[in-house]
Amino acid sequence: MLTGLIIGLIVVAIISVFVAKRPAPPIDADLGPDKVSFGTATPADQVFKVAEALPVSAAYKLGRADAGRGRVILSDGMTMNSYGYFYSVDIAPAAGGSTVTVSAKSKYPIQFGPIVRKQRDAARQKLVDALKAKLAGAI
């Protein structure tokens, strides 16, 4: 029994090191089909600046940013419920403002199932809410 516990802790430690050392994906990486989009009256260049400055908070870290593509890659750290996520924030000009599309992908590549999807959707929605709050203050 003690041997099983020790082996389990070693496996969790190895996965944690793998996830912590994993670099942000390339700027053009597809982070999956599940996306959330919302419109805003803020121009695309200002939305990009807000998304790029969002990692000033303790929750997110800037992975990559490309103003020409209107894309920011953010990441967050591990928690008790997840190994952390990579987020892509795509900003596109639209009539009367811009459209922001957010997607998320787990840092640990071998995760699937309804519980994982629910946690990923909740994490993505948390980022969407943070962006909306920052944009409301930026107008």
Residue spans for each PLM region:
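Ser/Thr-rich, low-complexity intrinsically disordered terminal regions
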Residues: G4-G8, V12-I139
